[in-house]
Amino acid sequence: MKISVIISNYNYARYLSRAINSVLAQTHSDIEIVIVDDGSTDNSRDVITQLQEQAPDKIKPIFQANQGQGGAFNAGFAAATGEVVAFLDADDVWKPHKLQRIVEVFQTSDVVGVMHHLDIIDGNDKTIDQASTQGPKLSEDLASVILQTGNAWCFPPTSGLAYRREVLEKVFPIDPVKWRIWADGCIIYCTAFLGKIKTLQENLAYYRIHGANNHMSAASATSEQEAKSQAGIEMTNQYINDFLVRIGYGARVDLSRNLQYRRTKYYQRSQWDLREVWGISRLILGWPFYSGQERAYYLARFLFKSGKFLLRSDVHTESTTI
């Protein structure tokens, strides 16, 4: 089974050799590497050219003007010839048996995609306190998960994704303007409605956090980053529903079911709203990714914070009636 590996690169020359060599070192050797340099201004072209000279039968370089991740994915997919297409960020690294493991799944099941999580490393390849991208255990019916949670994010990043080519042909090309970043989300959400997706409970790669990538945690997000994230969720939701119309899928994704989105919107308004408090509380109590203990904890925390909005509202009301 031939695997096409698409690597989108923009100014990651310092990490690129590690990424590409981790593919060349795979125990599954029937591969091609389509490396799309998206208008880099560092020495990425030199790095790619040198590596391609060392493995000309494996590496297909594409150099293009900057279009963002979506445009790079489009170019990479158009050049890919494998039965399965796997994605790798230019700053991440695969473990040697990663492709062999996903090939086993594709050859022994009818799933259209395979995902897995990643260990987390820093810019110097040091593992960060045994951290990983592990999330909730997901069923193969990702479409139901997405519909139930209003497209809440609970998936591995780019370097943990692989799909059968014939399925991606129904998704690509993607809109390069809307998906300049987070294009992996477009792929995950769209393919979920085209067949079963297997999520392996194994960390088969390393996800690098180094300050220059788009990694953002809820704890460290600024108000500007939160607003950008919320806008991204809204765009994603519209894109998914447009895609569902195109493929003739009956259901639509309802953003009001997305706990993360809805709770953040409420916090941003900072105003007491009984109807919204009730709605969000119900979402917390039924959230499929929380344990019973977590539901109790997050409900208490939400109500405590909402109570502050209520007190603030009461104070404001009194001050305006004096």
Swiss-Prot record:
One Pfam assignment: Glycos_transf_2
Enzyme class: transferase
Name this protein carries in UniProt: Uncharacterized glycosyltransferase alr2836
GO terms of molecular function: hexosyltransferase activity
Source organism per UniProt: Nostoc sp. (strain PCC 7120 / SAG 25.82 / UTEX 2576)
Keyword Glycosyltransferase appears in the UniProt entry: yes
Example of a GO biological process term: biosynthetic process
Protein family (similarity comment): Belongs to the glycosyltransferase 2 family.
Keywords: Glycosyltransferase, Transferase
Its EC number(s): 2.4.-.-
Signal peptide: none
Domain of life: Bacteria
The UniProt record lists the keyword Transferase: yes
